[in-house]
């Protein structure tokens, strides 16, 4: 596997996934593409209207770009080539479209960690990517290494 698509957001599990993806690409002499999905939705429109300072979308985009810059810095320090992209849409659908269109040979993403009851929790986007991906998917827990909580599908 040489083409790894990393779906990244600002969460401990996602940042751990970024570190693992960079390491895998380095070991496999592959290519890395990092994608962050800005969720389109009605909530953002309401927040934009209600926020006195405005610019909710702009702040979210700046935060997303900061996450992508973090991944680019990780890759640069490891000598790994990386492409970063920011897309808007529904997360699972956008991740799958990026994986298909690139084409990725492996999708790496962070798991959601633990729910309120302390049990492992996997968000709906991760579940949908696992269900509909046509390439292997590696879900990384917040600790950074695949473990009993990590799930591989494919």
Task: Give the positions of each predicted feature.
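Intrinsically disordered or low-complexity boundary/linker segments at protein termini
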Residues: 1-16, 131-154
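Small/aliphatic-rich secondary-structure junction motif
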Residues: 2-51
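Conserved beta-strand positions in the Rossmann-like core of class I SAM-dependent methyltransferases
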Residues: 33, 83, 138
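Acidic, proline/glycine-rich short linear motifs
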Residues: 36-66, 146-154
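Short secondary-structure boundary segments
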Residues: 36-37, 110-112, 141-142
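Short, hinge-like loop/turn segments at secondary-structure boundaries
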Residues: 49-53, 101-103, 125-126
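Structural beta-alpha unit
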Residues: 73-107, 144-154
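Glycine-rich, Arg-bearing micro-motifs that act as flexible, cationic patches
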Residues: 106-131, 146-150
């Amino acid at each position: 596997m040489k083409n790894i698509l990393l779906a990244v957001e600002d969460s401990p599990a996602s940042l751990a996934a970024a570190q693992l993806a960079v390491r895998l690409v380095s070991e496999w002499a592959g290519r890395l593409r990092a994608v962050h999905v800005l969720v389109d939705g009605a909530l953002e429109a309401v927040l934009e209207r209600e926020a006195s300072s405005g610019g909710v979308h702009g702040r979210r985009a700046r935060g997303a770009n900061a996450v992508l810059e973090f991944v680019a810095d990780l890759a640069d320090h490891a000598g790994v080539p990386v492409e970063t992209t920011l897309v808007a849409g529904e997360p699972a659908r956008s991740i799958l479209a990026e994986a298909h269109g690139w084409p990725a040979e492996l999708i790496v993403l962070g798991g959601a960690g633990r729910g309120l009851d302390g049990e492992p929790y996997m968000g709906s986007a991760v579940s949908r990517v696992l269900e509909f991906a046509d390439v292997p998917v590696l879900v990384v827990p917040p600790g950074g290494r695949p473990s009993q909580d990590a799930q591989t599908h494919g």
